[in-house]
């Protein structure tokens, strides 16, 4: 395993561990659909089972969401070879693999995703989400930064991309 893959693997494992740990702790200590206010009128821990994706879209389409997750992981794996090898990109790919895998595990084993981060911003109750979702969003933002900086082009990468 080359150095690039080791760094991404470490970030992936740490992310996946934190995702599953936080979900398990919330499930163990907070009743389903109960809300524990942490910062008044701003942030609560609210444990819910999400049978869909973001904003509960595609609710009860678990098999489809599992397939989408697996396809996403394969595409992201292939993209690893298109982007320059640097700390930011390693972190981005590790976060993406960890976040997507964390929710994939829930979908495959439980049939739903455990969500618990509940923010109210300017009286808008934002959809409840989890650490895996945060990891995916941060990973995507980091890759967008890489694209704007021109770090998405590696010389002689066409053969790796094709196979």
Question: What is each PLM-predicted segment?
Answer:
Residues 1-163:
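Alpha-helical transmembrane bundles and membrane-interface segments of multipass inner-membrane proteins
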């Amino acid at each position: 395993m080359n150095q690039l893959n080791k760094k991404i693997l470490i970030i992936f494992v740490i992310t996946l561990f934190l995702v599953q740990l936080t979900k398990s702790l919330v499930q163990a200590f907070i009743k389903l659909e109960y809300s524990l206010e942490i910062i008044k009128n701003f942030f609560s821990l609210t444990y819910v089972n999400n049978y869909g994706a973001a904003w509960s879209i595609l609710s009860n389409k678990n098999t489809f969401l599992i397939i989408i997750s697996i396809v996403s992981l394969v595409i992201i794996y292939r993209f690893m070879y298109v982007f320059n090898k640097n700390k930011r990109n390693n972190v981005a790919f590790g976060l993406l693999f960890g976040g997507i895998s964390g929710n994939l595990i829930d979908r495959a084993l439980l049939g739903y995703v455990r969500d618990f981060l509940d923010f109210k911003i300017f009286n808008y109750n934002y959809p409840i989400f989890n650490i895996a979702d945060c990891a995916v969003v941060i990973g995507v933002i980091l890759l967008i930064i890489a694209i704007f900086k021109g770090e998405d082009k590696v010389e002689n990468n066409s053969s790796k991309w094709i196979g």
